[in-house]
Amino acid sequence: MAESRSNRAAVQATNDDASASKLSCVKKGYMKDDYVHLFVKRPVRRSPIINRGYFSRWAAFRKLMSQFLLSGTSSKKQILSLGAGFDTTYFQLLDEGNGPNLYVELDFKEVTSKKAAVIQNSSQLRDKLGANASISIDEGQVLSDHYKLLPVDLRDIPKLRDVISFADMDLSLPTFIIAECVLIYLDPDSSRAIVNWSSKTFSTAVFFLYEQIHPDDAFGHQMIRNLESRGCALLSIDASPTLLAKERLFLDNGWQRAVAWDMLKVYGSFVDTQEKRRIERLELFDEFEEWHMMQEHYCVTYAVNDAMGIFGDFGFTREGGGERMSSSASSP
């Protein structure tokens, strides 16, 4: 019955909303992204609260990713983006001189075909992939030395394994796994299976999760209704409705340690103070009550497997404080 509240095409369309929101932020000066405009057909101007909310999400993601890329002594690292949509992070990292050894993006074929077409038709993107790159719009894939875009249904774990193998991911390398508003649209069993598979597959890894929480209060009820009216049911939210439940999702499925903060705390205590001062001057902002409620209903969770011992200083607090550890990881 839950599936009837979720429409695959509608969930994929949230990707267009995300790109439009990102472009709105870029145009207002919240952040730099020279490529997102290539994926937006009809630019829209978002409200200040949406712009600030999207900025806080982006800032937390980029700060944690930067920590990952700077961890340890080896420069050989890889990034795996689950449900990548039209994200342009790889191209931004190249411009910053921080491109990983391999960046793999996975999504439904309907999405990867559209993204492959944009890359094919844009020299701004295509030229960054190198002379050996091959692009197939029909197959929905892009293959290059350091970047791969591939189609897969994430719920199909055997196919997910095959795609990772096809992408030539090195399972021994430190890996940053991204899932932004992805797992929560899947049924709970599929979400757990992906978290469990990723833990078993990558022994030195960080999993970055961004999604909704607290469906049971008035704001949460309205959030759920709004999404369901668009065919975008959050099928997994009742299985992990709180910060503690988000942490348990990872700890119960093989990850060594995990921490979840709501976005109000992330913005207040983790996003760079100078950056906050800068963006808070960009637009008139008076929606403080709604801002607090909205930010309390989204969270960042990160989980860590640290076989190489390089992530001791990784995280919100940078000294490992406040993290929950699995019983096996905390045993002597």
UniProtKB/Swiss-Prot annotation:
Molecular-function GO term, any one: protein C-terminal leucine carboxyl O-methyltransferase activity
Record's catalysed reaction(s): [phosphatase 2A protein]-C-terminal L-leucine + S-adenosyl-L-methionine = [phosphatase 2A protein]-C-terminal L-leucine methyl ester + S-adenosyl-L-homocysteine
Principal location listed in the UniProt entry: cytoplasm
Induction note: Induced by brassinosteroids.
Disulfide bond sites: none
GO terms for cellular component: cytoplasm; membrane
UniProt membrane topology term: Peripheral membrane protein
Domain of life, source organism: Eukaryota
Subcellular location: Cytoplasm; Membrane
Disruption outcome: Reduced rosette size and early flowering. Reduced length of the main root and reduced number of lateral roots.
Keywords: Cytoplasm, Membrane, Methyltransferase, S-adenosyl-L-methionine, Stress response, Transferase
GO biological process assignments: methylation; negative regulation of brassinosteroid mediated signaling pathway
Top EC class of this enzyme: transferase
Gene3D superfamilies: Vaccinia Virus protein VP39
Binding site for S-adenosyl-L-methionine: K22, R57, G83, D107, D153, L154, E180
EC number: 2.1.1.233
Pfam families: LCM
Function: Methylates the carboxyl group of the C-terminal leucine residue of protein phosphatase 2A (PP2A) catalytic subunits to form alpha-leucine ester residues. Involved in brassinosteroid (BR) signaling. Plays a negative role in BR signaling pathway. Functions as a positive regulator of BRI1 receptor-kinase degradation. Methylates PP2A, thus facilitating its association with activated BRI1. This leads to receptor dephosphorylation and degradation, and thus to the termination of BR signaling. May act upstream of ASK7/BIN2. Involved in methylation of PP2A during environmental stress responses.
UniProt family annotation: Belongs to the methyltransferase superfamily. LCMT family.
Name of protein: Leucine carboxyl methyltransferase 1 homolog
Organism, scientific name: Arabidopsis thaliana
